[in-house]
Curated annotation (Swiss-Prot):
The keyword Cytoplasm applies. Zn(2+) binds at residues 78, 82. It comes from the Bacteria. Its cofactor is Zn(2+). The active site is at residue 79. This is Protein SprT. GO terms for biological process: response to stress. Residues 25-165 form the SprT-like domain.
Length: 170
């Protein structure tokens, strides 16, 4: 199937999934929710982004085309859950207990915070950094922040400071 036609079909699947998840949410909470606007402008490694105050969701077209089934079934409810939580509770932790409850109790899905898609095609240039336990690949933006001394990044596992792999030690 031609890519443009395939993309059109996937957009329809996303709209159907959004509508189904909205309907589940409205039945579960016994109230209506505003239908979000949807676009496909996200770039980089993010699969989707929810804009809470705009009631909008932006999806990554490339990751959608490369992972259609998982994208429709996991990413769409994930981003919609952020909007549902915002409409119910206002500003709370992005993947906090309210969001987790919507994912598990309303959508009957695991409350996974990150996708597992192969991001090689969308990743862009990376820079190798090391901590006490492993090598990390940082984006150009994070690398530049470190170089300009505007940010320090710590490993999520060992809490060690990330240092450039090619840094010359005194």
């Amino acid at each position: 199937m031609e890519q443009q036609t395939r993309f059109r079909h996937l957009k329809m699947q996303i709209q159907r999934k959004l509508n189904a998840c909205l309907q589940k949410s409205e039945q579960f909470f016994d109230r209506t929710f505003a239908v979000p606007t949807v676009s496909y402008e996200v770039r980089g490694i993010k699969a989707g982004v929810a804009y809470l105050q705009k009631n909008a969701i932006k999806f990554n077209r490339t990751l959608l085309l490369e992972n259609p089934s998982e994208f429709v079934n996991q990413v769409v409810p994930h981003e919609l859950a952020h909007l549902i939580v915002y409409q119910l509770f206002g500003r709370v932790k992005p993947h906090g207990k309210e969001w987790q409850a919507v994912m598990t109790n309303v959508f009957q899905l695991p409350a996974e915070t990150y996708h597992q898609f192969d991001v090689k095609s969308v990743q862009g240039k990376t820079f190798a950094y090391r901590c006490g336990c492993r090598i990390h690949q940082l984006s150009v933006r994070r690398h530049n922040k470190i170089q300009r001394e505007r940010a320090v990044y710590l490993c999520q596992y060992c809490k060690g400071r990330l240092e450039p792999v090619n840094k010359i030690c005194p």
